[in-house]
Amino acid sequence: MDIRIDDLNGPEIIELIGEHLQGMSLNSPIESIHALNLTQLKSKEITFWSAWEENELLGCGALKEINSSHGEVKSMRTSSLHLRKGVAKEILQHIIEEAQRRGYRLLSLETGSMDAFEPARKLYAIFGFDYCGPFSDYQEDPYSVFMKKAL
């Protein structure tokens, strides 16, 4: 698996981000969706990666810098054709390693509280993320859970 920085201009990644946003809208009320669109993902504080096997897109993930010691996991998504193949594990490990390389002391994330997000919550727990309260600009929301990992 080749995980590389992505400029978000290729048709495959545009389609996957569209699938990601559509999935969020099916499982969460609009006011509780914190997924970023393509324009937002291109902001300077976000590094975005895509995972490939030869010419096939497997998944994606991003790291947002909140401040010099705190990062946020964003836009974790596995292609529906590659679920349960370890793609998300590889991408999350890559993000954690990059956060450590940058010297972050804390890595946080927001994900959904509904059943559809249970696999994501389990993955984050396996990687040592613990439940916490809202961070950065987030507010309490019954459709969101917040997790953090000390690095």
Regions found by a protein language model. Give the residues of each.
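Acetyl-CoA-dependent GNAT
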Residues: 3-70, 74, 79, 92-93, ...
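Generic structural signal for conserved hydrophobic packing positions in ordered secondary structure
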Residues: 17, 73, 107-109, 117, ...
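Short hydrophobic/aromatic beta-strand or adjacent loop that forms the aromatic wall/cage
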Residues: 46, 142-146
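Conserved GNAT acetyl-CoA-binding A-motif
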Residues: 99-112
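Conserved beta-strand-loop-alpha-helix junction that forms the acyl-donor binding cleft
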Residues: 109-120, 138-142
